[in-house]
Amino acid sequence: MKRILIIGNYIFGRKYMEHSKRLGYEVILAATTAEEELSITEKSNIDYYIQIDYFREEYSLAKITEFYRKIPFDGVLAGHVFLPSLVNLVSKRLNLPFFGTEAIKNTTSKEKTREIMKEMEMFEANYFKFSSKDE
């Protein structure tokens, strides 16, 4: 059975947990919340839990790596927009698929994302950039 690690139980993370379970994955949640404080819904959508600290990346990486040695997983997702760098670190160190730092830099800015999508002819809508409050 495939396993997925989701770092962060914010709105994206909760959605990823639900979808992953529906797709038949075993779900591992890594979050700062104490396990006993997880909601009933969160608990029903996970198979394993790792308590980490989002702002202490090396500490979190060590906890996740220790878990991975016992129970390997196939991929990692970020459960919030501020977590891709931690996901990238974990994925790189554990030799798992990842988006890469350049992709993270380009997709955490809506403006950069829109420009790239427009270049790739994936973005049909017009959007406007303002350079001052007067515009």
Give the ranges of each region predicted by the language model.
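ATP-binding N-terminal substructure of ATP-dependent carboxylate-amine bond-forming enzymes
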Residues: M1-A103, D134
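Active-site nucleotide/adenylate-binding loops and adjacent lid/helix of ATP-dependent enzymes
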Residues: N106-E135
